[in-house]
């Protein structure tokens, strides 16, 4: 009996041992399979995770004035089934668009890194402060996305136009005084439709309400009332980016031209608010490669924005002669218009154009930028 009992005990112990071994093998196998599954999922994530990511960014405004603060919005969307941990978005942006949260960079560019944890089928939106330090046209094109050791560049365009800085009250008083001492200021704001100086033939852009029906019937062609200068205002702003023989240092000259664009933006805003027609020409190069700026005469808020956008694209580099752009603007069609020329000098060429403009029925005056900006040699 003792031998039988010992044999059964040994069998039970062996069975227990086998079961422990099988369980251990099962656990180890499960762990190994789990590790292989994780590695498999890791490879899938590495391969497809970024394909399921959508990233875009944009500024809260299409345009704003230098010195103002706007926001840059980032949106990261996970269109996949798996959560994405530690997604990094790296952006390099000019210091002229200052971002207080930037972590690194240099005097020219700043580095900005956003960190995201994105759950499946989730969109995260973040707002970042941007202080507009310098007039210009700026575009962000791509962003660097990093996840699990994979890096990719995603197209994500964002564009902002920084308009000339708004004038300080002292500058407003100074430019208004310069305009008032010229002969251009003695004209009322409101047009009297019942008073006119003469009758002339219709030209493109004339309003229908100034048609003279009696003269039209008598002459057999469309005739309109030609308003006297005292009845309304059409203003053409002309910015001269030539330095001439003034001897002004290049850096200081660029500052003066920046101020001239601020004057132009201010006067354009005043003209639009009062219902006047306003246009702009400048002999500077632009970011688009053009050698001059030309904004046709018009009214309304859209025209104001067009002028501001043109100024944001302007570079303080001479691209054409002042005489040429005035000739192109006049071209025999400029009538009853006040032409205000901003320049650091007056030479024979400018005097000749002023005489030509006045001979063709316009008023013209030159605003001395050295005087209006209080420049001291």
Stretch-by-stretch model annotation:
Residues 1-57, 62-65, 342:
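Extracellular/lumenal glycan-associated context and N-glycosylation machinery
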Residues 1-11, 76-78, 154, 287, ...:
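Intrinsic structural disorder
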Residues 9, 18, 173-174, 179, ...:
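Low-complexity, compositionally biased segments
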Residues 11, 25, 94-97, 160-165, ...:
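Short, structured coil/loop segments at alpha-helix boundaries
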Residues 22-26, 86, 188, 225, ...:
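Intrinsic-disorder/low-complexity, polar/charged segments
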Residues 24-25, 133, 198, 203-204, ...:
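General structural signal for secondary-structure boundaries
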Residues 39-288:
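An amphipathic, basic-hydrophobic helix/alpha-beta surface used to engage anionic
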Residues 269-377:
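Acidic, glycine-rich A-domain
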């Amino acid at each position: 009996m003792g031998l039988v009992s010992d044999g059964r005990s040994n069998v039970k112990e062996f069975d227990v041992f086998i079961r422990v071994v099988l369980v251990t093998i099962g656990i180890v196998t499960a762990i190994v399979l789990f590790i292989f599954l994780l590695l498999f999922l890791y490879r899938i994530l590495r391969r497809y995770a970024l394909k399921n990511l959508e990233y875009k960014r944009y500024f809260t405004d299409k345009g704003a004035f230098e010195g103002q603060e706007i926001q840059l919005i980032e949106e990261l969307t996970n269109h996949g089934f798996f959560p994405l941990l530690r997604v990094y978005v790296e952006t390099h942006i000019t210091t002229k668009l200052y971002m207080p949260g930037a972590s690194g960079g240099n005097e020219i560019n700043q580095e900005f890194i956003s960190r995201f944890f994105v759950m499946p089928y989730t969109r995260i939106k973040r707002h970042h402060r941007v202080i507009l330090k310098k007039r210009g046209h700026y575009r962000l094109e791509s962003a660097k996305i990093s996840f699990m050791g994979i890096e990719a560049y995603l197209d994500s365009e964002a564009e902002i136009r920084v308009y000339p800085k708004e004038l300080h009250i002292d500058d407003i008083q100074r430019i208004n005084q310069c305009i008032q001492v010229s002969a251009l200021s003695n004209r009322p704001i409101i047009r009297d439709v019942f008073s006119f100086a003469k009758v002339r033939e219709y030209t493109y852009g004339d309003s229908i309400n100034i048609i003279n029906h009696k003269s039209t019937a008598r002459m057999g062609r469309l005739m309109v009332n030609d308003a006297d200068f005292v009845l309304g205002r059409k203003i053409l702003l002309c910015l001269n980016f030539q330095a001439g023989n003034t001897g002004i240092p290049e850096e200081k000259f660029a500052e003066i031209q920046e101020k001239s664009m601020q004057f132009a933006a201010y006067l354009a805003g005043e003209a639009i608010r009062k219902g006047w027609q306003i246009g702009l020409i400048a002999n500077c190069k632009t970011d688009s490669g053009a050698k001059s700026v030309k904004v046709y005469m018009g009214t309304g808020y859209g025209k104001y924005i067009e002028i501001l956008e043109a100024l944001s694209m302007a570079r303080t580099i001479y691209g054409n002669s002042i005489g040429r752009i005035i000739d192109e603007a006049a071209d025999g069609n400029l009538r009853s218009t006040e032409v205000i020329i901003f320049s650091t000098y007056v030479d024979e060429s400018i005097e000749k154009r002023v005489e030509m403009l006045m001979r063709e029925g316009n008023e013209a005056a030159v605003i001395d930028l050295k005087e209006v900006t209080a420049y001291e040699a």
